[in-house]
Amino acid sequence: MKFLFLFLAILLATKIPVISGKRHNLRCMGNSGICRASCKKNEQPYLYCRNYQACCLQSYMRISISGKEENTDWSYEKQWPRLP
């Protein structure tokens, strides 16, 4: 009986870490993508993350290279520049 209490005391004192089943994923592209070694079937690789893995974005994501919100109003007047 003393051995059991001693074993429990040692077990609780060491605090064995519990490993969860889900890993922490790095986010990229303003939290729109996930850094992975290989992208899933419905994702497209775009650039690379800090850990040299591909930044995987959903195939429907739009990428703005200008860094600001783009104007998506595509009326006929805004498609072509005005002539002087």
From Swiss-Prot:
<dbReference type="GO" id="GO:0001530">
    <property type="term" value="F:lipopolysaccharide binding"/>
</dbReference>
<feature type="disulfide bond">
    <location>
        <begin position="39"/>
        <end position="56"/>
    </location>
</feature>
<keyword id="KW-0929">Antimicrobial</keyword>
<keyword id="KW-0732">Signal</keyword>
<dbReference type="GO" id="GO:0050830">
    <property type="term" value="P:defense response to Gram-positive bacterium"/>
</dbReference>
<keyword id="KW-0044">Antibiotic</keyword>
<feature type="signal peptide">
    <location>
        <begin position="1"/>
        <end position="21"/>
    </location>
</feature>
<dbReference type="Pfam" id="PF14862">
    <property type="entry name" value="Defensin_big"/>
</dbReference>
<comment type="function">
    <text>Has antibacterial activity.</text>
</comment>
<dbReference type="GO" id="GO:0050829">
    <property type="term" value="P:defense response to Gram-negative bacterium"/>
</dbReference>
<protein>
    <recommendedName>
        <fullName>Beta-defensin 119</fullName>
    </recommendedName>
</protein>
<comment type="similarity">
    <text>Belongs to the beta-defensin family.</text>
</comment>
<feature type="disulfide bond">
    <location>
        <begin position="28"/>
        <end position="55"/>
    </location>
</feature>
<dbReference type="GO" id="GO:0061760">
    <property type="term" value="P:antifungal innate immune response"/>
</dbReference>
<keyword id="KW-0964">Secreted</keyword>
<keyword id="KW-1015">Disulfide bond</keyword>
<keyword id="KW-0211">Defensin</keyword>
<feature type="disulfide bond">
    <location>
        <begin position="35"/>
        <end position="49"/>
    </location>
</feature>
<dbReference type="GO" id="GO:0005576">
    <property type="term" value="C:extracellular region"/>
</dbReference>
<dbReference type="InterPro" id="IPR028060">
    <property type="entry name" value="Defensin_big_dom"/>
</dbReference>
